[in-house]
């Protein structure tokens, strides 16, 4: 299951953080994927709007400190 999912709707890019079991807390993989997605969006001539959302009941609980210890 990808930690970041994207959907395009015309000129709109929907970016969904997808770690609902951790309340979408960021880990290294998610941070990197979000950075890549943002770079792709910024350099796109076709996309005008980016919407960030989270899967499940939370947008994001912040950074997953347990993943830092691993």
Regions found by a protein language model. Give the residues of each.
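Conserved CoA-thioester-binding segment of acyl-CoA-metabolizing enzymes
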Residues: 1-55, 61, 69
């Amino acid at each position: 299951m990808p930690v970041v999912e994207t959907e395009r709707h015309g000129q709109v890019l929907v970016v969904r953080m997808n770690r609902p079991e951790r309340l979408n807390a960021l880990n290294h993989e998610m941070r990197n994927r979000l950075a890549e997605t943002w770079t792709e969006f910024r350099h796109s001539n076709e996309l005008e709007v980016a919407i960030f959302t989270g899967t499940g009941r939370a947008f994001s609980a912040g950074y997953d400190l347990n993943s830092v210890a691993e």
